A protein has these predicted regions:
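Short beta-strand/loop segment that forms part of the nucleotide-sugar
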Residues: 29-38, 58-60
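A conserved acidic beta->alpha catalytic loop
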Residues: 21, 36-45
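Short aromatic/hydrophobic "clamp" motif used to bind/position activated sugar donors
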Residues: 83
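Conserved nucleotide-sugar donor-binding catalytic segment
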Residues: 138-212
């Protein structure tokens, strides 16, 4: 069983296309878990209009949680053997699920990180695939290497349930869920990179991820967080 986990917020422009690209690759036994973080647009109505029994909308939180801890709510309810992360605004390319599952079987990996095409809007309003994420951010192994410079992009990740059990609950004040899950995978030494683009990673004004919107923390924030991250990882998973 596959659990696709998605956090949404004001994603009406793209969420239907993304969900259709996902659902077409799943079996009847799989699930798509969605937690909305208080959207003020038609995101929830669009999701509900699909009327697909595999989609489960998690009851809302009484307050906004932000993308990291909203996703944690979804992950904590996942029932599948394999967990796939999905952003609300991307597009899964045909064959993504089958190729990732084949890689799991071939490598005995706990976590697969695959490549993606950047998907940008042209001046004429059409969308076009550009460079690959791995060209901009070449992936690398190692805990301290990934604390220094993160390889992991959540929407390009899938992992086994045993890794999810290690990653939850998220540490407090976690700025990036993908880096945390990736570090948990690096600790097991069972992370693998699949160098084939399997999604269109959409770039637009309202991206929540740092890779797309160029947000930068201060040097002090980075140092404090990196030290905290290593300490938590070692205490959680052992030396």
């Amino acid at each position: 069983m596959i659990s696709v986990c998605m956090a949404t917020y004001n994603g009406e422009a793209f969420v239907q296309e993304q969900l259709l690209s996902i659902l077409s690759q799943l079996s009847a036994e799989d699930e798509v878990l969605i937690a909305d973080d208080g959207s003020t647009d038609a995101t929830l109505e669009i999701i509900q209009s699909l009327k697909d029994p595999r989609i489960q909308i998690i009851p809302p939180s009484p307050r906004r949680l932000g993308p990291v801890y909203n996703l944690e709510r979804v992950l904590s309810r996942a029932q599948g053997k394999w967990i796939f992360l999905a952003d609300q605004d991307d597009v899964w390319l045909p064959g993504k699920v089958s190729k990732v599952l084949a890689e799991f079987e071939k490598t005995a990996a706990d976590c697969i990180l695959h490549d993606a095409f950047f998907y940008r809007k042209n001046q004429d309003g059409t969308w076009e695939c550009g460079n690959r994420i791995f060209e901009i951010r070449p992936p690398h192994h190692g805990i301290f290497s990934n604390v220094k410079k993160n390889s992991y992009t959540g929407c390009c990740m899938a992992f086994r349930r045993n890794l999810l059990d290690k990653a939850l609950p998220f540490p407090q004040s976690l700025p990036m869920h993908d880096q945390w899950i990736g570090l948990c995978a690096e600790k097991t030494k069972k992370a693998r990179f699949l160098r084939e683009p399997l999604i269109k990673y959409r770039i637009h004004l309202h991206n929540a991820t740092d890779l797309a919107n160029g947000k930068r923390a201060s040097l002090g924030q980075k140092i404090l967080w990196r030290w905290s991250l290593v300490r938590i990882l070692l205490s959680r998973l052992g030396r």
